[in-house]
């Protein structure tokens, strides 16, 4: 069932992410809320505060200094746990803490193994840095609204294969993705669910044990529509039979 509003979706997302993180200590997870016009930062800060109450420390990482500074401003209680992708990578590859004002000032001893890294809004341009961050981290990682797919043109077959292998490691802890005439949802540990948009709202259409591609979604929606038409025609036939008696 689709959540009726953002706060319900958030609650579902947080619960699903906690469920996912409680499993594999080296898990690679994604969380996607793809609403048009969504202000992602407040959601991410609420998520970070929620996870910060757990046993494992968190690091909240952003693509650039501007986004990190905005997060520190809006979430001052998390400021010491906020940095950019590149700042964190430099710190994790060095025994010395980075200078104050450039990112994290509370390095985690032991190689950050127990930390949960939360990477927000990683794009294709960030792919190399994100891959390096993840390779240097032995603990759990969460990508929030990532956009790492594509961008492999011109890097050669070896590079493309390496990228496919890296992207294949990730599993959705939570996803709520509006599509044209439908919506896709996944809440760990349950299956992916596809919903069809009807005049009176969304209706469940199909479930999948993997993230369905466009062809699979279209096939499920067409099959669902055909089933609906068939039921309607049978109802009309029964009505006509009743009138003729």
Set out the residue ranges of the language-model regions:
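A conserved mid-domain beta-alpha-beta active-site/ligand-binding segment of alpha/beta enzyme cores
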Residues: 152-227
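Glycine-rich loops and low-complexity Gly/Arg-rich segments
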Residues: 54-56, 84-87, 141-146, 166-170, ...
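Extended, charge-rich low-complexity interaction segments
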Residues: 107, 111-116, 121-129, 173-188
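Short C-terminal domain-edge/linker segments immediately following a structured domain
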Residues: 60-63, 90-92, 148-152, 172-175
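Positively charged, amphipathic N-terminal segments that serve as targeting/anchoring signals
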Residues: 1-125, 136, 239
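A short, gly/pro- and small-residue-rich
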Residues: 124-150, 156
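Long terminal accessory regions outside catalytic cores
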Residues: 221-245
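Short, solvent-exposed coil/turn linker segments
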Residues: 84, 103-105, 213-218, 232
């Amino acid at each position: 069932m689709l959540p009726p509003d953002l706060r319900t979706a958030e609650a579902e997302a947080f619960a699903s992410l906690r469920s996912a993180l409680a499993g594999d200590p080296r898990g690679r997870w994604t969380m996607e809320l793809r609403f048009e016009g969504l202000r992602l930062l407040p959601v991410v800060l609420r998520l970070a505060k929620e996870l910060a109450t757990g046993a494992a420390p968190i690091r909240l990482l952003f693509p650039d200094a501007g986004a990190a500074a905005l997060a520190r401003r809006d979430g001052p209680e998390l400021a010491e746990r906020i940095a950019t992708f590149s700042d964190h990578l430099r710190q994790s590859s060095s025994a010395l803490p980075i200078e104050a004002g450039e990112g994290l000032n509370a390095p985690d001893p032991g190689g950050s193994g127990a930390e949960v890294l939360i990477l927000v809004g990683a794009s294709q341009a960030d792919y190399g840095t994100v891959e390096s961050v993840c390779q240097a981290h032995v603990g759990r990682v969460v990508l929030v609204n990532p956009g790492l797919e594509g961008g492999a043109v011109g890097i050669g077959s070896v590079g493309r294969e390496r990228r496919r292998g890296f992207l294949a490691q990730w599993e959705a802890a939570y996803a709520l993705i509006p599509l044209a005439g439908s919506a896709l949802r996944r809440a760990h540990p349950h299956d992916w669910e596809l919903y069809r948009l009807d005049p009176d709202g969304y209706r469940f259409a199909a479930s999948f044990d993997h993230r369905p591609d466009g062809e699979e979604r279209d096939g499920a929606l067409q099959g669902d529509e055909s089933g609906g038409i068939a039921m309607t025609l049978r109802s009309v036939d029964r009505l006509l039979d009743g009138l003729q008696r």
